[in-house]
Amino acid sequence: PTSELAYKAAIKALEDAKVSAEELDMIIVATISADCNTPSTACILQEKLGAKNAAAFDLSAACSGFVYGSAIATQFIETGVYKKVLVVGAETLSKFVNWHDRNTCIIFADGAGAAVYGEVEQGYGMLSFDLGADGSGATTIEIPGGGSKHPADQESIDNHMHCLHMNGKETFRFAVKAMGSTVMKSLERAGLQKEDIDYLIPHQANIRIIESAAKRLHLPMDKVFVNIEKYGNASAASIPIAMAEAYQSGKLKKGEIIALSGFGAGLTWASCIMKWAKED
């Protein structure tokens, strides 16, 4: 289940941050493939970790979810309400694809990534973010069955309504515009220019979308982290997995300006600008 992948990523993040589970004030799990409708995967993860002092909830913003969660986490920290927040992006989308539908089954993946947010020195950490949604595109990427509108029954199962459906052309058209424009808004809010970006970590959906966003931001591809060829599209897990790999490979240096950018079902989009605070 998704909670197992979330647990493995969370343990690694806590170890790297040198934070115990009991120190966590909040757990946010971004996912569209929760273990079940209720309880939340975050509550299941809280129990697995032994994070008995943490509030816990799931967040459904699809591939934008990790950035949404990161924005929420840092607001709680900046206001002084909480000190340590765990944000996890976790998915098991292999369980939600129709294996006869090449629009989805060869693209979507399982995975999890996590980050622990806490207080950092002045001027570092989250500098700005941009979150957005356009519900008029709700049917562009959807799992129509299994909810209160189309509860599970024989007809919905026969019609694969519990599986992920995607209009690839519409998704591409939306993504190419959204990826670059949301980063530009975050840069503006941070008082920065696109030339100030040291590294872009985009949602790993499609290499052409990533290249298009990089071109719009005038970024050479050597400043853009890409690992889609290894994992495919892991939805909410894609950005934290990429961020962890970029960090572990020594690509993220303290003081550098890092941009995260995602888009997904909803339709949703999100970006944030960080000044990397972690030592090598």
What is each stretch, according to the model?
Residues A30-D35, A61-S64, G89-S94, G132-D134, ...:
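Acidic, glycine-rich active-site loops and adjacent beta-strand->loop/helix elements
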Residues E78-A112:
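Flexible, glycine-rich active-site loops centered on histidine and acidic residues
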